[in-house]
Amino acid sequence: VTTEAAIQVRYPKMMLSVLMAGTFTGLFGETALNMALTNLMSQFSLSAGQAQWLVTGYLLTLAVFVPVSAFLVRWFNTRVLILTALCVSLAGCLIAALAPGFAVLLLGRVIQAVGTGVILPVMMSAALLIFSVYQRGMVMGMVGIAITLAPALGPTISGFIITLFSWHAIFWLSALVYAAIILLAVKSIAPIGDITRPRIDILSLLLSSAGFSGIIYGLAILAEHSLRDPAVWGSLLAGFSALPYLPAVRRTWRCR
C-alpha cells in the first residue's frame, strides 16, 4: 500500500482545516436558529409552522445540493468551487442578518445552505485524497467530530448569543467566521480531482432530490401533524419510493 496521498497539495492540513471550518459553520447554522424561533414568531407575526420553515428550508436545500455537488466537482475547478461556495454562504448570512422580514430571512437561510451543501461533500473527498491511507482513520475521525458537533452546539451557542444580543448576531458572527475562512482558503485551497465534464444524470439528481427532500420534509412536519395527515405520509412515501430506483437508474446510465 502506498504511503503517499492520492493527490499532493502544498498545505493539506490547512486545507482540511479550512474545509472543516466551513462545514462546521454551515452545519452550526442548521440548528442555530432553533432558539430564536419564538422571537421570530413574535417579531414577524408567524405561526409555528411558518417559523419552522427557517429550519426545514435549510435541511431541504442541503438534501438537494449535497448530491448535486458530486457533479459540480467534475465540472468545475475545485478551488474555484470551494471559494464560490464559501462566498455564497457568506452572502446568505449577510442577507439573513439584514433581513427586514420573514421572506428575506428564509432566502438568506437557503442561500447559506447552498454553500454548505457544496462544501460538505468536497470536504469528505478531500479528506480521502490529500492524506495517505495511514492518516485517513484519524482524519475521518476529526471530520466526523466536526459534522456531529456543529449541529449539536448550534442551539447552545445561539441561545447564549440571543441572550446577550439578538438573533441578528447569529448571522453577523457566522459572516465574520466565513470572511476569515475565505481569507485562509485563498492561500490553502488547491484543486483536487480532474475536470472530466461527464454527462449530467438528470434523472438520478431528480430522484435523489425528491427522495431525501420528501423524507426530510415528512419528518419535519411530523412534529406538528399526525402520521395520518396526507402531507406527512405522502411526503414520506414519495421520498422512500424514489430512493430505491437510484441504483437501477445509475446502472442504466453507465451502460449508455
Where are these regions (language model features)?
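Hydrophobic transmembrane alpha-helices of multi-pass secondary transporters
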Residues: 11-27, 58, 88, 104, ...
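Helix-loop-helix hairpins in multi-pass membrane proteins, especially solute transporters
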Residues: 66, 70-203
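Short, Lys/Arg-rich, polar N-terminal cytosolic tail immediately upstream
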Residues: 1-8
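Hydrophobic transmembrane-helix bundles of small-molecule transporters
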Residues: 163-256
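Hydrophobic core positions of alpha-helical segments in small-molecule transporters
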Residues: 18-21, 54-57, 84, 107-108, ...
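Extracytoplasmic
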Residues: 11-69, 119
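Residue-level hotspots within pore-lining transmembrane alpha-helices
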Residues: 25-29, 95, 99, 111, ...
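Short helix-kink/termination motifs in transmembrane helices of multi-pass secondary transporters
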Residues: 25-36, 61, 78, 170, ...
